[in-house]
Design a protein with these regions (language model features):
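Beta-strand-rich N-terminal accessory domains
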Residues: 21-91
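Bacterial Sec-dependent N-terminal signal peptides
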Residues: 1-23
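Generic structural motif
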Residues: 15, 41-43, 53, 65, ...
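Contiguous beta-strand segments within globular domains
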Residues: 42, 172-174
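Extended, loop-rich substrate-binding clefts of extracytoplasmic carbohydrate-active enzymes
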Residues: 86-172
């Protein structure tokens, strides 16, 4: 793939609370924890996780304005009576099922070593820009095979918006 441009728009409606027009989106970079925390006013909305132990970067957990977590706990923080299937489905993320025959969608730490050669890894390479004035941050990653050979270079800008009744973010890929 020479050029990949995709826009994903997710709109998360507020359950019990309404945010004022003058709400502020704030990013806190936490390099030691390998994450960027995204706050709306003083309330955590989500975190962009880019740990070396992940097979792709994710937004996790995601909360409503009333504080209800809308992402499941497993596999990061399993909850009582929660199913423990699909370890690759953590939070909100972007991936493909097949690029040059490699599965970037289903990869996780539960794949047997003898099957790893069939799976790709999205390796975080850096934060390019955090722009609170425009409510967005840009990150870069390499899509690699199990030996580290780079198939794609990704540059993603996460943009966040707040209105009276909903919050949203978009994730255009370049």
């Amino acid at each position: 793939m020479n050029k990949l441009i995709l826009l994903i728009l997710f709109s998360l409606s507020y359950c019990n609370a309404v945010i004022g027009q003058d709400s502020h989106i704030h990013f806190i970079e936490k390099p030691d924890s390998q994450k960027i925390s995204i706050y709306i006013d003083q309330t955590l909305f989500t975190e962009f996780l880019y740990s070396d132990t992940l097979y792709k970067q994710v937004l996790y957990p995601i909360y409503t304005a009333s504080g209800t977590e809308i992402t499941r706990g497993y596999p990061a923080r399993p909850k009582a009576d929660e199913r423990t299937d699909h370890p690759h489905q953590m939070g909100l993320w972007f991936s493909f099922g097949s690029i040059n025959g490699l599965d970037f969608w289903n990869n996780s730490n539960r794949i047997p070593l003898d099957k790893k050669e069939h799976y790709g890894i999205i390796r975080f390479t850096g934060i390019k820009n955090i722009n609170e004035k425009e409510n967005q941050f840009t990150v870069e990653a390499n899509w690699t095979n199990h030996n580290g050979y780079i198939l794609l270079k990704e540059k993603t800008t996460y943009a966040f918006t707040v209105s009276h009744t909903k919050e949203a973010f978009s994730e255009p890929l370049h």
